[in-house]
Every structure is written in structure tokens, then in C-alpha cells.
């Protein structure tokens, strides 16, 4: 198959074709340097300017105030599960977690290694298909931060509201939803996101952190590579940053502006998700486990009423150029991820295939 396919994978996800073509054209000789972007030193004026431009573009998109730091860190977003409690918890503090899916469960268990974490809600017994009722929780007096995952990539669950914390810093894993919908940065103490959904390719983690959270470092001293304050003071250049990822991210930020900004993409994302859910709800052949009020816009989880047909389904979808529809190994079933770069044409092609498969096998 020579033509581009529709990649419904949860990550790495589709990137806009125009960005890939730009990167291809610039790959051997970036900005007339005679070098590839992969070869240029990270402390050269060109790369320092690239990082500065990327940060400024992200600040404009999200309206990030000056009292927040933007960090471009190498590695998986999962590292933040440990970095957050290490940086934000003092002796005697505790962290409160909403456990609404696999990723928040993992984050809680990582924080609990310090024996300083508790959960406000745990939706695992119900199968991670719903969100806790609004404001039905109580924080301990020694709570240093509240942690939640607005969009659970694996389980397809989305918070329809931002938890109120009474002034306690709110920490959010926005790996699969940052830049897909408008947010108010001032509601958060810290936001982080892996890049491989809506930002760039895998290997970059973006952290947005309020300056107040950098002022009180817990004892003992945090290792330098895991210290937010250290990375902020060095403007993401304490160690070699993932330059190529930042390069693609910078292009993505500018692309988002051409799409009507985050608000424009959010409207499009809502339409894409609504169209797919509407079809899935119209037939008994496909099952959707998540309660309607908690459905994700980015990650639509579903299954077949005849599970033994799943391998056939995936094979035929793959032959049609509909890739990576298999659900996560921890959740099973099927999943269609509709990130920013997924066009409506991809959703239409998927619905057409779903309809045909149901008619032929129902």
C-alpha cells in the first residue's frame, strides 16, 4: 500500500501530512545550515531560538501566564508519575488521586511508593467506565496536591468537569488531550503531556508548572535530572533535549493556529467523536462500555458483540487502510483514537467499514 492510511492508534498518532512533508524537505539541510536538524548542537543559537519559538507558540495557544514555566523534557510522560511526588511532597504531606483508569492507577501506585498518597475515588471496581460524582470528596488537611487524568487513553473515559480543590494545586496528566480542547491554565498547578498524541513524535514530555511549586524543595535533595526547578532554571537545556521532537512540536503549534486554534480543533474533534458514537449507538453489533456522560472525545473504546470476530475485524480493517484499531492489552476490545490530525474523512471511512462489517457478520 503506497498511499497514506488512517492511523487510529493511541500513540504514536497521526501527524498532519503537510508537517511530515515539510520535515522531509528540510531534513538534509535545515535553515541553510548544511546540516540535518538531527545533527545540530543543542546549545547553538539555532536550537536555542527553536526552543524559544516553540515555547512562545505554546504560550500563545494556551494563554500561559508568565508565572508558569514551560519545560521540554526528554523521555516518557510516565516518568512524571515519580517526578511529581518527588518534587511536590514535603515530609508529612500527602497527595490525593482520582483513579479513573489505567494511567491514573499507575500514577497513584508510583506516588504511593513514598507512602504519602491516598485516593479520593477509585473507579476500578466498576470497570473504569465512569467518573466520580462532582464534588463528592473530601481532602485531608495535609494534601499538597490533587492529581487526575482528564482523559484516560486506555479506557476512553473523560472528565466532563475540572475538579475543585479549594486552593490545593491541581495536577493533570493531559497526555491524550492537551491542545485538543480549551483549558484555563490558571486552574492548574502542573500539567504534563507526552508528545505522541497531539504534539509531536514520541520521546518528548511537555510540563507546564506554576512557579510557586518550585519554591519549596523537599528533603532529601532531588536528583538533578528529576528536579523541575533545575530544568526551569536551565530553560530545558540542563541536558540534551529531544531536539527533533521539539522541532516537530513547533511545527504542530503553528499548524494548530491555521486550524482555527484550539477552539476550532475542539469543535471539529467534538463533531468527529459525536459522529462515531452516533453510529455505534445505532447498532447492537457494537458495544460501548463507557457511560455517556464520561465518554472520551479522543479515544473511543468499543467491542464486537461476537468477540470471536475480532481478529477478522482487525485484519479486514487493516486491509482497508484503517490501522491500529486494537484496544490496549490491559483493556482489550477495540479503540479508535481521533486526535487532532485525524480528518473527518478518516471517521467516515471507519463508519463505512463498521457498517459493512456488521451487515456481513451480524
From Swiss-Prot:
Species this chain originates from: Legionella pneumophila (strain Corby)
Domain of life of the source: Bacteria
InterPro entries recorded: Aminotrans_V_dom, Aminotrans_V_PyrdxlP_BS, Pser_aminoTfrase, PyrdxlP-dep_Trfase, PyrdxlP-dep_Trfase_major, PyrdxlP-dep_Trfase_small
GO biological process terms on file: L-serine biosynthetic process; pyridoxine biosynthetic process
Residues reported to bind L-glutamate: 43
Compartments reported by the entry: Cytoplasm
GO cellular component labels: cytoplasm
Keyword match NAD: no
Protein name (database record): Phosphoserine aminotransferase
